Design a protein with these regions (language model features):
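Phosphate-binding beta-alpha-beta segment of Rossmann-like dinucleotide-binding domains, i.e.
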Residues: 86-145
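Rossmann-fold NAD(P)-dependent oxidoreductase module
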Residues: 21, 105, 109, 157, ...
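Rossmann-like dinucleotide/phosphate-binding beta-alpha-beta segment
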Residues: 135-174
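Short beta->alpha junction loops/turns
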Residues: 11, 73, 96-99, 151
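An N-terminal-biased, well-structured beta-alpha scaffold segment characteristic
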Residues: 1-92
Length: 174
């Protein structure tokens, strides 16, 4: 028994790499790319899995579809339309896969601003050489409190980084 997986949308080089890796890892997996509407309607008739965005018209021939992989962590408004919600299709997304990367990036900014690097970088760029190191707006992080607004995956990972730097952390989820 084979499993047919369809990528909806245009080929971009990355998708082909994923498809190759998927086919090598999963014996019997058939991967298709459907960028044109007519081809999407045909390929979805036998598909068990799909990556992309469906609409009402594309859902009609997708009788065998069991899994829809959303192309974003937070799909746009209208992605989950009533017919899709009422179907037996399992929908997954990227939620959580960037928590560590984004929280590390946030901490890079916290460290930069806490040491006044944004001022020094601007001065250096403008060839402004001053002896203002002793007047640096440095903030000692263990004496600071971080307010995390939104304690989902990224907020929780950021809170953990802040704790590692000795900060008091307050998290709220609006």
């Amino acid at each position: 028994m084979s499993f047919k997986f369809v990528f909806l949308g245009k080929k971009d080089g990355i998708i082909e790499k994923y498809a190759t890796a998927m086919q090598e890892a999963v014996p019997g997996l058939e991967v298709y790319f459907a960028s044109e509407r007519d081809q999407q309607l045909v390929d979805l008739t036998e598909a068990s899995g799909c990556f992309g965005t469906l609409d009402k018209e594309l859902l009609v021939p997708a009788k065998k579809l069991e899994w829809l992989a959303a192309p974003a962590a937070g799909p746009p408004r209208g992605y989950y339309f009533p017919e899709l919600i009422e179907s037996n299709i399992q929908v997954t997304n990227f939620r959580g896969i960037f928590n560590d990367h984004i929280s590390s990036h946030i901490m890079a900014f916290v460290l930069c601003f806490s040491r006044g690097m944004h001022v020094f970088f601007a001065d250096q760029f403008n060839q402004k050489w001053t002896n203002s190191g002793e007047k640096s707006p440095a903030v000692h992080l263990p004496e600071s409190t971080a307010l995390i607004v939104g304690v989902g995956g990224i907020g929780a990972a950021t809170a953990l980084h802040c704790k590692h730097f000795g900060m008091e952390v307050i998290g709220i989820d609006p």
